[in-house]
Amino acid sequence: MTDSNGQKDNNQDQAQPADPVVSKPYIMPDDPEEGTNEALVREAAEARDKMLRTLAEMENLRRRTAKEVADARTYGVSAFARDVLEIADNLQRALDAVPAEARANADAGLKGLIEGVELTERSLINALEKNGVKKFDPQGEKFDPNFQQAMYEVPDPSVPAGTVVQVVQAGFMIGERVLRPALVGVSKGGAKPAPAAANGNEGGVA
C-alpha cells in the first residue's frame, strides 16, 4: 500500500512540468585590447614628452656651452690686455713728457727716438684691436658712469653741466664689456643738459 502510494506520488512528481528556462541577454566582455591600446597611447605620450624635454635640455646646454666658448675667446685675454695697456700708457706718458718745443727743436737722434716710441705705442693699440680690445675717447660726450670715471669737475659755463671736457686717460672696451673706464674731467656750472627727445614729442606726431 505504502509502496504503491509512494510510487504513485513519484509518478505525480515526475509528471509536473519543469520551470521554464529564461535566457539572459549575452553581455560582451570588455575588449582586452582596448585597455592595452590606451596604455600604449599613454606610454607613447609620456615617452614623447620625455624626449622633448631631453632635446630642450640638450639644446639649452649646447647654447650655454657655445656662449661660454665665445665668451672665453672674447674675454679670455682680459688680464693680458690690461697688462699691455699699462705698457701703452707708459709709452704715452713718455711722449707727453717731451714738450712740443723740444720736439720741434730736437735733433735727428731724439726725433728718431720719439718716432720709435710713437710707432711702438700704435703697434700695441693695433694688436689690442685685433683681439677685440677697442679704445674710446668720450671727449665732448655726456658723462656716463658706466663707461667713465670722473676725476674732477671743471667750471665751464659754455657747455651743459655733466659734459666730458677733458680726458685724462682713454677708456677701452673688450667685446661688450668695459675693460677700463675712461678717466675724465666733467663740466659744472653750465646750462642743464637738453631734455631727451622723447620728452620733446608731447603734442607732436606719434
Curated annotation (Swiss-Prot):
Fetch the SUPFAM superfamilies from UniProt. Answer: Coiled-coil domain of nucleotide exchange factor GrpE (SSF58014), Head domain of nucleotide exchange factor GrpE (SSF51064)
UniProt region (Disordered), positions on chain: 1-38
Q: Does the keyword Zinc apply?
A: no
Q: Which PROSITE patterns match?
A: GRPE (PS01071)
Gene3D superfamilies for the chain: 3.90.20.20, Head domain of nucleotide exchange factor GrpE (2.30.22.10)
Q: Per its UniProt record, what Pfam families does this chain match?
A: GrpE (PF01025)
Q: Which CDD domains match?
A: GrpE
InterPro entries referenced in this protein's UniProt entry, alphabetically? GrpE (IPR000740), GrpE_coiled_coil (IPR013805), GrpE_head (IPR009012)
One annotated GO molecular function is:
protein homodimerization activity
Tell me where on the tree of life, at the top rank, the source sits.
Answer: Bacteria
Q: Which portions of the chain have biased composition (kind: Polar residues)?
A: 1-15
Compartment list: Cytoplasm
Where is this protein chiefly located? Answer: cytoplasm
Matches recorded under PANTHER family = GRPE PROTEIN, GRPE PROTEIN HOMOLOG, MITOCHONDRIAL
Q: What does this protein do?
A: Participates actively in the response to hyperosmotic and heat shock by preventing the aggregation of stress-denatured proteins, in association with DnaK and GrpE. It is the nucleotide exchange factor for DnaK and may function as a thermosensor. Unfolded proteins bind initially to DnaJ; upon interaction with the DnaJ-bound protein, DnaK hydrolyzes its bound ATP, resulting in the formation of a stable complex. GrpE releases ADP from DnaK; ATP binding to DnaK triggers the release of the substrate protein, thus completing the reaction cycle.
State the oligomer form and interacting partners.
Homodimer.
Q: What is this protein called?
A: Protein GrpE
The gene it comes from is grpE
